[in-house]
From Swiss-Prot:
Pfam families: GatB_N (PF02934). HAMAP family: GatE. It is an enzyme of class 6 (ligase). One of its GO terms (cellular component) is cytoplasm. This is Glutamyl-tRNA(Gln) amidotransferase subunit E. GO terms for molecular function: aminoacyl-tRNA ligase activity; ATP binding; glutaminyl-tRNA synthase (glutamine-hydrolyzing) activity. Its EC number is 6.3.5.-. Heterodimer of GatD and GatE. InterPro entries: Asn/Gln-tRNA_amidoTrfase_suB/E, Asn/Gln-tRNA_Trfase_suB/E_cat, GAD-like_sf, GatE, Gln-tRNA_amidoTrfase_suB_CS, Gln_synth/guanido_kin_cat_dom. It comes from Thermoplasma acidophilum (strain ATCC 25905 / DSM 1728 / JCM 9062 / NBRC 15155 / AMRC-C165).
Length: 603
């Protein structure tokens, strides 16, 4: 199978917001909120985009949190201002470093987006560079476009049918670099993303928040293009490509099985109200479904054993779709009896529906008013998969991917009328020439020469694109300790806590630790506490950061020895940690252990 892979790599810039003069960082919390309901509109040719149509069907409301780095432009109550010149110059500089042709005029377009992530219902985007390329270990990779666009609002939470967004991220300049499908495999994709990342980050104008770098992976095995949006970590690129390969291979196997039995039948799939069949059920999910609207079931002809059977997981495809409409109570016959349903209840359901041996049954808790819409959506999705048209937009979920929405098309683009065309003149070109991106090798060598860290640590820092974070941390702690924080301590804490802390907070903690004269062990303890609490101020007041004195350490050691524990030089540190959560210097603890042990031996 001919696999094609391409990337769209997005980098936020720290230049100031793109269409107003607000800063990219906020210094206070919520100022106010307002609500909107977005409605679909046709393109200039009169067509309606499939992705926009899908979002419209979800009929959601949106609430926006106003922050101190947002204004009337983000609220869509005032026209956009002239685009930030420094952001444009940075995009031109990056385009040149990627061997692109620079456009003569920058013309903004509107891209319809009605998922609530922009108050206007569209995103402004413009092409800056075209027809570039980068060299890689597996040959050249063509760069199709470099765009400068506004970032979307940041999703905070979903409450029922309402989505809450913050305006703090809306309007931040975003460089989007799109490659042609020249990437040969998942490891090559990681290499390409890194190579592009070094160039953008080394401009000095890239933002370094948790969500400042995002990759979209375009993947095809001949069954249509799948766009996996919002991959935040480089290593996750490898994971989602591997998963998507396996997913599509397994869907092919499921489809072949369904077709060998005669295929899917639209007439048979008719969601019927089966609430009365479960009037006395002990299943909490079914009871809850009946109370909230009703339980409906339908036959999926010839699909038995394809919904959840080893690697065949068509049921997940259905569940992902239904979940996107805010519906959670979905069950199917490949996992029944289960969920508190008895064998007798399941058999009664099958008899009522007239289930055949090769048929599957779908059971869903849903309000009656949404039944027909969900029924059509489910059937259309299954039919699309059976035709092996797998094109759609998906999102990362750990090492897997989940359905987000149909693939958008050209019908969502139309001209921007509020922003004049920008001529790329000598002034912009001169500004861009003062911004000098560097290669990976240059960045690594500079870290080794300037800070005296090992080449291995320098390569990790460069490859993970945390160079600026390292430099900022190294202002407050010794360079080797700064490298250790980013290469060992932070990755370990992220694995253990499943949390990602913004580098700005880590830098602030290091700054405060210098003021408080923390030693290495107090700082490392403070970092652990930061991953518990998120807030730097509350971390510094934690009693665990009060370092144990020599006498306190000796007292703990005496207690351990008197209890009869077999304390040795290899075990004493762990034994002390069992007795106290407070921080201590292991070297001092070893000295105290030897002193106490020797004194005991005298007697």
């Amino acid at each position: 199978m001919d696999t094609k892979i391409g990337l769209e790599v997005h980098f936020q810039l720290n230049t100031g917001k793109l269409f107003c003069r607000c800063p990219v960082e906020q210094s206070s919390g919520e100022l106010m909120r307002f609500s909107r309901k977005l409605h679909i509109s046709a393109s200039e040719l009169g067509n309606i985009d499939a992705a926009a149509s899908y979002e419209s069907m979800r009929s959601r409301s949106f609430q926006y949190v106003v922050t101190d780095n947002s204004c009337l432009v983000e609220m869509d109550e005032e026209p956009p201002k002239t685009p930030d010149e420094r952001a444009i110059a940075t995009a031109i500089s990056v385009s040149k470093a990627l061997n692109c042709d620079i456009v003569d005029h920058i013309t903004y377009m509107r891209k319809i987006v009605i998922d609530g992530s922009n108050t206007t219902g569209f995103q402004r985007t413009a092409i800056v560079g075209i027809n570039g390329h980068i060299e890689t270990s597996k040959g050249p990779v063509r760069i199709s476009t470099v765009c400068l666009e506004e970032d979307a609002a940041r999703k905070i939470e979903e409450i029922g049918n309402t989505v809450v967004y913050s305006l703090d991220r809306l309007g931040i300049p975003l460089i989007e670099i799109s490659t042609e499908p020249d990437i040969v495999d998942e490891d090559h994709a990681v290499e390409v993303a890194r190579s592009i990342g070094y160039i953008v980050i080394s401009t000095g104008n890239a933002r370094h928040a948790v969500d400042a770098v995002r990759q979209d992976v375009n993947f095809s095995m001949g069954y249509g293009r799948v766009e996996i949006k919002g991959v935040s970590k480089l290593t996750q690129i490898r994971d989602v490509i591997r998963y998507e390969k396996e997913r599509q291979e397994n869907l092919r196997a499921a489809v072949d099985l369904i077709k060998s039995r005669g295929g899917l039948d639209r007439v048979s799939f008719n969601l019927k109200d089966v609430s009365d069949l479960f009037a006395g059920t002990k299943s909490k999910i079914i009871r809850s479904g009946i109370e909230s609207g009703g339980v409906y079931a339908g036959i999926l002809k010839n699909m038995a054993g394809t919904l959840k059977n080893g690697k065949l997981r068509m049921g997940k495809e259905i569940a992902d779709l239904v979940r996107s409409y805010g519906i959670k109570g979905v069950m199917h016959s490949d996992e029944l009896p289960g969920y508190g349903l008895t064998q007798d209840e399941v058999e009664a359901l099958y008899r009522y529906l007239g289930k055949g041996d090769n048929d599957a049954v779908l059971l869903i808790a849903i309000n009656q008013s949404r039944v027909k819409m969900i029924e059509n959506s489910i059937f259309d999705r299954i039919q699309k998969i059976i035709s092996m048209d797998l094109s759609e937009t998906r999102g990362p979920a750990g090492e897997e991917t989940v359905f987000l929405r149909p693939m958008p098309g050209k019908d969502r683009m139309y001209p921007e009328t509020d922003i004049p065309v920008i001529k790329v003149d000598s002034k912009l070109m001169e500004m861009s020439s003062s911004i000098k991106p560097r290669t990976y090798a240059e960045v690594v060598q500079d870290l080794v020469d300037r800070y005296g860290i090992s080449k291995q640590n320098a390569e990790y820092i460069a490859s993970e694109m945390v160079v600026d974070a390292f430099r900022n941390i190294a202002e407050f702690v010794e360079a080797r300790e700064a490298a250790r924080i980013l290469t060992q301590i932070v990755p370990d804490l992220e694995r253990r806590t499943k949390k990602i802390i913004d580098h700005d907070r880590i830098i602030e903690l290091c700054r405060r630790s210098k003021d408080l004269h923390f030693d290495r062990y107090q700082l490392e303890m403070a970092l652990e506490i930061l991953y518990e609490r998120d807030d730097v101020a509350s971390v510094l007041g934690d009693s665990r950061l009060k370092e144990l004195s020599r006498e306190e350490i000796k007292s703990i050691i005496r207690e351990i020895l008197s209890s009869g524990r077999n304390a040795t030089q290899n075990s004493i540190i762990a034994l002390i940690k069992e007795k106290t959560e407070r921080v201590f210097d292991p070297r001092v603890a070893m000295e105290c252990f030897n002193e106490v042990k020797n004194k005991n031996n005298v007697f």
